[in-house]
Every structure is written in structure tokens, then in C-alpha cells.
Regions:
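Conserved ankyrin/ankyrin-like repeat signature
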Residues: 35, 67-68, 100-101, 131-132, ...
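Ankyrin repeat boundary/linker residues
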Residues: 50, 83, 114-116, 147, ...
Length: 209
């Protein structure tokens, strides 16, 4: 009987915690800083993850909730936690173009670079966020990092037609001769996309046919 009671109590506790976490995520999505602070004061762990492995900090970063990001970091949310897919809060903020959040995360110790895999700079160039690109480069991001798909940040910007992001990268003099998985350069990608502005930009940066 005692074991049965313990099991029932444990299930009840888990149910309450899950419900509280769902409510916390809802508050984060709505940008309700006061409600989020209340849940944290009640002892809810800011590093708890949802079914997809996203922490509360990741959700707030993806949505650009700068005030909430600062609050969560002050409550010991870990900025370098990764999802099963390898995403971090900084990567999600970079993808969304949330410069203020990116700055807060980096100032709190978020890793700008990684030894392997996707980086925040890859995400920023892929999405075409030039201000984030410049900031990450200024903070030491590897301008020539090769993503798992074989592309550099410059190639990602060019392939997606992001002129401003490509310009932001070219100010830092990346390697314009690098080749992608099929042997294509950034210039070849620009030509394939019929983007004359990018073609001219790359040629001025030293890219050759």
C-alpha cells in the first residue's frame, strides 16, 4: 500500500510540474515577464526542457524577448545548453535577427563559435540578418566556418540572395575562393541565382570565374 501511495504522489508531482512548465512556456511566448518571474520564484528550474529539448531560455531567445532572456540568465539559465539537434539559444536568436538578445547572450558567456557543426554565424547569414552578422564577426566568429552541409557563411548568404548579409561578411574579408560540396564557389552560386548585385559584389571582393 505504501508503494502505491508513493507512486500516486510521484505521478501527481510530475503532473503538477508538467502543467507549471507548460504555463511557464505560455508566459514566455506572451512576453509576460512578471508571470515568468513568479514561476521562477516558486522554484521552477529555468533549465527544464520541453519535449523537443528546448529550454525556456531558448524559447525566449527565439522570440526575441530580451527582458525575459536577462531574467532567465540571472536565474542561472545555462546559455550553452543544446537541443538534440545541436541548437543553442544564441543560434536561435541569430536566426531570428534579435540583435539585443544576441548581445545579452554573448555578454553572459554564450559561445560565439563551435569546433564543428552549425554556428550562430551560419544561422545569421542563412536568414539574412546583417546586423547580427557584423556583431558576431566583431566578437570573433569564424567567418570561414564550414557548416554540416558544406557551405560557409558567405555561401549561405549568397545562396539565399541576402545581399546585405553578404556585404557584412565581405567587410571582414572571408575566403571567396572556398568551394561547396558540389565544387561551387560563392560566385557560382550568385550566378546560378541570377543575382547580378551579388555577382558584382563578389567580383569586387576578388572572386574569379
Amino acid at each position: 500500500m505504501r508503494l502505491l501511495i508513493q507512486a500516486i504522489v510521484l505521478l501527481w508531482i510530475c503532473s503538477v510540474q508538467a502543467q507549471s512548465f507548460d504555463q511557464l512556456i505560455d508566459a514566455v511566448e506572451k512576453g509576460d515577464t512578471q508571470k515568468v518571474a513568479g514561476y521562477l520564484q516558486q522554484g521552477l528550474d529555468p533549465n527544464t526542457t520541453d519535449a523537443q529539448g528546448h529550454t525556456i531560455l531558448m524559447v525566449a531567445s527565439r522570440l526575441g524577448r530580451a527582458e525575459l532572456v536577462s531574467l532567465l540568465l540571472s536565474q542561472r539559465a545555462r546559455p550553452n545548453r543544446q537541443t538534440p539537434a545541436g541548437d543553442t539559444a544564441l543560434m536561435l536568436a541569430s536566426l531570428g535577427g534579435h540583435l539585443e538578445v544576441v548581445r545579452i547572450l554573448v555578454d553572459s558567456g554564450a559561445d560565439v563559435d563551435r569546433k564543428a557543426g552549425w554556428t550562430p554565424l551560419h544561422y545569421a547569414t542563412f536568414a539574412g540578418n546583417p546586423e547580427v552578422v557584423r556583431y558576431l564577426l566583431d566578437r570573433g566568429a569564424n567567418k570561414n566556418a564550414v557548416a554540416p552541409n558544406g557551405y560557409t557563411p558567405l555561401m549561405l548568404a549568397v545562396r539565399n540572395g541576402h545581399v546585405a548579409a553578404a556585404k557584412a561578411l565581405l567587410y571582414d574579408d572571408p575566403d571567396v575562393t572556398r568551394k561547396g560540396p558540389a565544387g561551387e564557389t560563392a560566385l557560382a552560386l550568385a550566378q546560378r541565382g541570377n543575382n547580378q548585385e551579388l555577382v558584382d559584389l563578389l567580383k569586387r571582393a576578388g572572386a574569379a570565374e
